[in-house]
């Protein structure tokens, strides 16, 4: 991971200076406040440096010679990339020193607060530990659904039904999972983005078949639904829905449902009901508890 990867993702940021391709190690931007005050913790910088309004106002109080000295001390730490927000003009001394010390610089019209959020999220996803799972990933009613199960149970066919119902397709077969700020983000490997394999039909391009508006690059995984062949001797299925079951992905617990596949059951409809019910449960509503309360009221009468 170096400045080229950041610029590729944020291609609307202007490349002001092309420098060395030093590896970015940290998933957090640094504002170099301590370094500007001549307090140096590290001998080199391995994080993306972000300068905005605060840094600009700080440097503005000094004469040109002292400003040059302060910036030069930062650049001597060879940061892998410096990003300038809309409040920090990319001109003069900065560009001269960037060329001298072989530092890459990007400038943008974004605010420092937005930049911090965008870049930190991007770096966290790219640098975080990954887990690869087999399944399909669809977004329903704003929630990401990881559909799992053995081959031949109709995951892809179910995904097609859900897309036709207006839901979003993210990935088929291979799901790349990342822990981003304790949220599991799922996406397709780049080379498979937008493609869906259907048994008996082959590979289809979901964006071409269903429309580009039905395909999304990534989503948070909010629920795991596993499809299994119906066998009461092997599996125990939830009947009352009193409590949520969970499975872990990269240390994060995610609501989990085990759904039996039986003749005549339309799986896509079941999944829509599950997601709608889960949204209610996450908002504090529980159908079983309401039924239990009404049963107690009837007993009192």
Swiss-Prot record:
> Gene3D superfamilies given for it?
HprK N-terminal domain-like, P-loop containing nucleotide triphosphate hydrolases
Which residues does the annotated region (Important for the catalytic mechanism of both phosphorylation and dephosphorylation) include?
196-205
Keyword Nucleotide-binding in the entry? The reply is yes
Q: What EC number(s) are associated with this protein in UniProt? A: 2.7.11.-, 2.7.4.-
The cofactors named for this UniProt entry are:
Mg(2+)
Q: Which residues bind Mg(2+)?
A: 156, 197
State the residue spans of region: Important for the catalytic mechanism of dephosphorylation.
260-265
Q: tRNA-binding: is it a keyword of this entry? A: no
Q: The organism sits in which domain of life?
A: Bacteria
- Residues binding ATP, per UniProt: 149-156
User: Which reactions is this enzyme annotated as catalysing?
Assistant: [HPr protein]-L-serine + ATP = [HPr protein]-O-phospho-L-serine + ADP + H(+); [HPr protein]-O-phospho-L-serine + phosphate + H(+) = [HPr protein]-L-serine + diphosphate
Q: Which UniProt keyword terms apply here?
A: ATP-binding, Carbohydrate metabolism, Kinase, Magnesium, Metal-binding, Multifunctional enzyme, Nucleotide-binding, Serine/threonine-protein kinase, Transferase
**Active site per the UniProt annotation:** 134, 155, 173 (proton acceptor), 239
Report further notes. Both phosphorylation and phosphorolysis are carried out by the same active site and suggest a common mechanism for both reactions.
Q: What does this protein do?
A: Catalyzes the ATP- as well as the pyrophosphate-dependent phosphorylation of a specific serine residue in HPr, a phosphocarrier protein of the phosphoenolpyruvate-dependent sugar phosphotransferase system (PTS). HprK/P also catalyzes the pyrophosphate-producing, inorganic phosphate-dependent dephosphorylation (phosphorolysis) of seryl-phosphorylated HPr (P-Ser-HPr).
Q: Which proteins does it associate with, and in what oligomeric form?
A: Homohexamer.
The name this protein carries in UniProt is HPr kinase/phosphorylase
Give the source lineage, highest ranks first: Bacteria, Bacillati, Mycoplasmatota, Mycoplasmoidales, Mycoplasmoidaceae
